[in-house]
């Protein structure tokens, strides 16, 4: 006598429920800076990563971000994507940000089953299930982790530029339009790292 059909359905449900969900969080940094690339990070957190300590990178101190960045990198799958100042000038900052996100996602060495992205726009990617979440960096640990890694990575790059272009104090303003930075631009002009499509650089 054969087994009842209901057992087959039950087994099917159990099998489906056991499918592992792989969630990736994605965020970008540096959109408002007057210089350099916009950075994006994609992060798949491991179970060993402490999600409770992950917060939006903007509300963390520099020291906190650097400590958390090391913790995240040690306990996750992650990747960085960038769009250069030239790419930003060629199109616009939104499209460049989405391109950086796309590059970060494509560099992950494991394919996520779902991608959660900070903001209200999605990059153009096939074969990925994606969802945009406004203020996701404040709500979703995976996105918070991405914001931290992206922020630390970009800040280190800008600080490295400041050693050569010390007149602009990029190690302090990180390329943003502070009064001191604008005065330095007026006095010394611009160089190849500036986003020429950005006000007040654009004339």
Give short role names for the model-derived ranges:
Residues 1-203:
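RNase H-like, Mg2+-dependent phosphodiesterase core
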């Amino acid at each position: 006598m054969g087994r009842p059909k209901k057992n087959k359905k039950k087994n099917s449900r159990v099998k489906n429920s056991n499918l592992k969900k792989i969630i990736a969080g994605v965020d970008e940094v540096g959109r408002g800076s007057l210089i350099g690339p916009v950075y994006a990070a994609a992060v798949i957190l491991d179970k060993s990563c402490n999600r409770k300590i992950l917060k939006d990178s903007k509300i963390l101190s520099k020291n906190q971000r650097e400590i958390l960045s090391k913790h995240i990198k040690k306990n996750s799958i992650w990747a960085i994507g960038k769009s250069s100042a030239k790419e930003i000038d060629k199109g616009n900052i939104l499209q460049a940000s989405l391109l950086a996100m796309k590059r970060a996602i494509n560099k992950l060495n494991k394919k996520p089953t779902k991608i959660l992205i900070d903001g209200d726009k999605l990059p153009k990617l096939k074969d990925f299930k994606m969802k945009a979440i406004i203020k996701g960096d404040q709500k979703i640990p995976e996105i918070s982790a991405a914001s931290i890694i992206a922020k630390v990575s970009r800040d280190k790059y800008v600080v490295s530029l400041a050693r050569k272009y010390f007149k602009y104090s990029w190690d302090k303003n990180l390329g943003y339009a502070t009064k001191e930075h604008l005065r330095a631009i007026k006095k010394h002009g611009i160089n190849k790292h500036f986003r020429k499509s950005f006000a007040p650089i654009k004339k």
